[in-house]
Regions:
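Short "lid" loop at the C-terminus of a central beta-strand within the Rossmann-like core
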Residues: 122-128
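A short beta-strand submotif of the Rossmann-like class I SAM-dependent methyltransferase core
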Residues: 87-93
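Conserved N-terminal segment of class I S-adenosyl-L-methionine
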Residues: 1-87, 103-107, 112, 123, ...
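A short His-aromatic
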Residues: 96-97, 101
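Short glycine-centered segments of the SAM/dcSAM-binding site in methyltransferase folds
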Residues: 115-118
Length: 187
């Protein structure tokens, strides 16, 4: 088993309040806009935590569709759905993934995405520490790093929004031409 995932499984098991899914709400308006703009019908929340954003807070009602859920550290959601999905989003997840595992992670995300990807990434150390004592944010980098990683390791071009927050607040859109081409085909 992956050492990092094992650490997160232990962390999730410690308290019901550890990573419940509360990082979706601050990003929800961006994702709702993407769902509407692309007319997305199928979604994947990549790194959903315990999923309370759907079971308790009902954020899927704002999205207009219930997404598939994936989180390798939560037994109920540890199997990655095959897809494809119109949209894939991940909020406060990428910074928890070691740099050496990012190529595989981006492959998993971008190979399944058809219309859009939204990534919200924190750029400062976490408050949380893992059972090992390490900071939960092992990859704290500015937006330029993330754009380079996406461009280098995505198996295909996908309309992508990247938002960073924390010590480096930024927002960029990649492959906007993909959306514009799709949009023009609608008329």
């Amino acid at each position: 088993m992956n050492w990092w995932i094992d650490q997160y499984k232990q962390y999730h098991a410690e308290l019901n309040t550890n990573y419940p899914g509360n990082n979706l709400k601050p990003q929800l308006h961006h994702i709702v806009d993407l769902v509407k703009d692309t007319k997305a019908k199928t979604l994947l929340d990549f790194g959903c935590g315990k999923g309370l954003q759907y079971t308790k807070w009902k954020h899927h009602e704002e999205l207009g569709v219930m997404p598939e859920l994936y989180d390798p550290a939560v037994p109920e959601y540890e199997k990655l759905p095959d897809g494809p999905f119109d949209g894939i989003y991940s909020t406060d997840v990428m910074e928890h993934i070691p740099k050496e595992q990012l190529p595989e992670t981006f492959y998993k995300i971008f190979s399944r995405a058809e219309k859009f990807v939204f990534l919200a990434i924190c750029t400062k150390p976490a408050i949380a520490t893992l059972p090992s004592g390490e900071n939960a944010h092992c990859t704290v980098e500015p937006i330029g790093f993330w754009v380079t990683m996406i461009e280098r390791y995505s198996p295909k071009r996908v309309y992508t929004h990247v938002k960073t927050y924390g010590n480096c607040n930024n927002y960029t859109i990649l492959n906007e031409d993909m959306y514009l081409e799709w949009y023009l085909e609608q008329f």
